[in-house]
Structures are given as C-alpha cells and as structure tokens.
C-alpha cells in the first residue's frame, strides 16, 4: 500500500509539474536578478553589474502564446578606465516597462520578444573612490530597447534570461546606447 501511495504521489506531482497555464488565465510574477550592462560607442568601457527587480503580469492567450507586461527597476551603465589613472562608473538606473510576446515552444520553455520603454531615475558618476555625484553628461529621460530572451518555468518558478538591445541614445550629446543582459528568477502566482 505504501508503494502505491508513493507511485501515485509521484505521478500527480509530474502532472502538475508539466501543466501549462490555462488559456485565458492571468498570473503575476515578482522577480529578482542580476543585470550586466554596458554602453555601446564608449571606447574601453566595461560592464557594470547590478540589480534588476520588479513584477510582471502575464495573460495566456493560447496554448503556445502569452503576452506580458511588467515594471522592473534596473541598474545599468558602464565602467571605464582612463589612461590607467581614473576609474569611473556611470550609474544609469531605470524603471523599465517590458511588453513581451512569449511563445512556448515546449512545455515550460518560452522564446520572448518585445519592446521596452525605460524611464531614467538616476544618472550618477563615481570617480575613483569619491562619492557618486550627478553626471554632467545629461541622460535621456526615456530609453527604448528591444528585449529578446528565453525563459524556463518549473513548478511556477521561472528562470528568465534576456538581452535588452538599446535602440535609442542613452545621453543627449553622444551616440552611446544601453546594452544589457539580465538573468532573473521569479515565481508565478495565478490570479
């Protein structure tokens, strides 16, 4: 009897593990992770590693297609070294609003593509070991990027990896654009 209960429990857990969200359902997903950012067109720049955190909502439109929108705080920018004398970190922080189409190619695995407006909330520069100050290079207040990614969901946990390809200038007087790779872990709550 004990063996039958164990086998039945394993079978039920595997069914719930591979269950797709029902068509027409909504879910909410808090998520947190790491962003690895850089600025294009900045010679000698290096990645700035930072936090990305927020929430996304998803609507399951069909068995294979869902649409999602979210609000994510993202630390972006870049580091640079000038003539081996000055280390500078450009700290661009954004509130990003990703709007994504998610195509589930197999159960749990989604390919993602969308558009993401971002709103600059901080533009500071830190030079050597001094305190960060407002950056004299004025950042654009709105940033636009194209997010492309993959996610995998298991037991409502979702691991998401995406690249945000900047299509608008990050600053008013340069051609530098944001280039950001993000990895997040979230948990989906059905509504």
What are these regions (language model features)?
Residues 23-25, 42-50, 88-94, 137-143, ...:
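Transmembrane beta-barrel outer-membrane domains
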Residues 30-34, 51-59, 71-73, 97-103, ...:
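Residues on the lipid-exposed face of transmembrane beta-strands in outer-membrane beta-barrel proteins
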Residues 40-46, 79-86, 123-131, 171-176:
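Outer-membrane beta-barrel translocator domains and adjoining extracellular loop/strand segments
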Residues 20-61, 67-68, 166:
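Short glycine/proline- and aromatic-enriched beta-strand/turn motifs that initiate or cap beta-hairpins
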Residues 21-23, 60-62, 106, 154-157, ...:
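Outer-membrane beta-barrel channels and translocator barrels
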Residues 79-113:
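Helix-adjacent hinge/juxtasegments
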Residues 1-31, 185, 189-191:
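Bacterial Sec-dependent N-terminal signal peptides
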Residues 70, 76-81, 89, 134-191:
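Predominantly the C-terminal beta-signal and adjacent terminal strand-loop region
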């Amino acid at each position: 009897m004990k063996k039958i209960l164990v086998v039945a429990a394993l079978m039920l857990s595997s069914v719930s593990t591979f269950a797709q969200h029902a068509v027409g359902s909504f879910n909410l997903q808090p998520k947190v992770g790491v962003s690895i950012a850089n600025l294009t067109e900045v010679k000698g720049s290096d990645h700035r590693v930072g936090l990305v955190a927020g929430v996304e909502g998803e609507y399951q439109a069909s068995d294979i297609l869902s649409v999602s929108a979210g609000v994510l705080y993202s630390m972006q920018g870049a580091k640079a070294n000038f003539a081996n004398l000055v280390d500078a970190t450009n700290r661009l922080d954004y509130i990003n609003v990703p709007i994504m189409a998610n195509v589930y190619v197999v159960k749990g695995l989604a390919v993602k593509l969308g558009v993401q407006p971002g709103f600059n909330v901080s533009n500071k520069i830190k030079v050597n070991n001094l305190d960060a100050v407002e950056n004299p290079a004025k950042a654009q207040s709105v940033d636009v990027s194209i997010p492309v990614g993959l996610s995998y969901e298991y037991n409502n946990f979702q691991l998401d990896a995406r690249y945000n390809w900047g299509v608008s200038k990050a600053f008013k007087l340069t051609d530098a654009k944001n280039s950001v790779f993000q990895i997040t872990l979230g948990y989906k709550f059905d509504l």
